[in-house]
């Protein structure tokens, strides 16, 4: 991998990690279109550490508040004593499903599921499901039903969204896409669904990144060029990712996810067309 490729892939990761359009899909598609080698699942997981740092910085106050409440609750023998402490434990519990399924299907995730056929199918399928969630929002608005805010999230919502997050193990589905969609089905506001999605991403993305970094450590140490490129891609992903978070939170306050639904369907169909015409290999 060249430095130029690392920068482009870092930008792709940062732009698409938080938008509901799948960063993994773009890290698979961009190299295929450019004629580069697939960077692999390990590269994807490690570069996500950059976007993890973006979440830590953007939601720094929320994270400090929640973490402090969890620690204080444990010290006072009242782990669920405050809403912030409860939020921390709900995030932890919501992370369990993706960890379990990730370990069970690790081989498939890193190999067969990275096929562009799977990616295009996931892009289109989630777009259809997300459009259904948007339709439900309109129905609720017509009935005068108010959407839920962060303070309204309960164990039911957290656990269901956490379970739904497991679908993100399929490349092309989008971790933020499936969790935001799950939140919308649970009547969270679009902004709240995005905020909870980003906070829920922290444990899973951190664990996946550290695991893949550990697995790849020897090969990275053996190649200074690969290590430098990975660091550059991670830094670029973090910077672009921060801007992407700010954009999406602001965007969803005023707009629906329609533009992302259209983009996902168009991209999925384009990939299938490129495969059919022999322009890219699945």
UniProtKB/Swiss-Prot annotation:
Membrane topology, from the record: Multi-pass membrane protein
Transmembrane segments: 40-60, 85-105, 117-137, 158-178, 193-213, 231-251, 258-278
UniProt keyword annotation of Transmembrane helix present: yes
Catalytic activity: di-trans,octa-cis-undecaprenyl diphosphate + H2O = di-trans,octa-cis-undecaprenyl phosphate + phosphate + H(+)
GO biological process: cell wall organization; peptidoglycan biosynthetic process; regulation of cell shape; response to antibiotic
GO MF annotations, alphabetized: undecaprenyl-diphosphatase activity
Keyword terms, alphabetized: Antibiotic resistance, Cell inner membrane, Cell membrane, Cell shape, Cell wall biogenesis/degradation, Hydrolase, Membrane, Peptidoglycan synthesis, Transmembrane, Transmembrane helix
GO cellular component labels: plasma membrane
Protein EC: 3.6.1.27
Principal location class: membrane
Additional record remark: Bacitracin is thought to be involved in the inhibition of peptidoglycan synthesis by sequestering undecaprenyl diphosphate, thereby reducing the pool of lipid carrier available.
Similarity comment text for this entry: Belongs to the UppP family.
Name listed for the protein in its UniProt record: Undecaprenyl-diphosphatase
Organism: Prosthecochloris aestuarii (strain DSM 271 / SK 413)
